[in-house]
Amino acid sequence: MINPTTKDLISSARKDVHIDLSKSELSRFNIVHPLDLITLPHNALPEMDFDDVDTSCEFLNKELSFPFMITGMTGGTPRGNRLNLAFAEVANQCGVAFGVGSQRSSIANGKSQKELRKLAPKIPIIGNIGGIQLAQENGLELAKAAIEDLEADALAIHLNPLQEIIQPEGESNWSGVLNSIEIAVKTLPCPILIKEVGAGISLPVAKKLHNVGVYYIDVACAGGTSWARIEAERLPKSQRELYEPFLDWGHLITDILPEMRQILQQI
């Protein structure tokens, strides 16, 4: 059984603050998103019937209407859970995958999210816990509880060292996370997906993950919402200035995707 700690109670309160801050322009990366700079070539002679275009695909043994996933963002509070219920319902209607935000708080506080599976029976649902939490004493127990509660098709392990180091209550001991991921891959009853939260996953890190059996990676590069900026807004101004160089820190998707082709046949 996972019992709530003071950290879990603080985490619940923090999640609502995150929701409020994420609606502010101050939470956005101060960069031009690299995908906005890409122009796709126009084909004036397609030589095909558009009615033959089929965007459907299979992901985690379930069919999607097109390759798209609403990735994990929030949860663990009544407001966060209402958002997840809305996301799950829309994802099921559209036939796309859906992932929840970190489940640590909801599990520790005995707040089940089973309703999500009832709303979204047809699509892949991805659970979520942090890499640091996985490496702690009850990490595997937490992971199993997260999977069971959602009847999850996969479990995302999020890697967020930049966010944690800026977060006032953040945890900084990342020792043993890779080993814990390897154990999770070998022992948990569903696939493991590794995701960043906005700073990206480099090729060397992706290779380490692949070497321990990970086949699903969400690189989650810089652009859009910045968790570094959200956490910095919660700090006193004097401390915020200390982290100024890291507020737009992160790999660009246009740099990372070509690199990932080196191991694309394996993941």
Descriptions of predicted regions:
Residues 1-60, 64:
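An N-cap/entry alpha-helix motif that binds or orients negatively charged groups
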Residues 17, 27-35, 59-61, 85-91, ...:
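A broad, low-specificity signal for short, low-complexity segments enriched in glycine/proline
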Residues 51, 79-83, 107-111, 138, ...:
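Short secondary-structure boundary/capping elements
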Residues 88-93, 121-125, 131-267:
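Alpha/beta enzyme core
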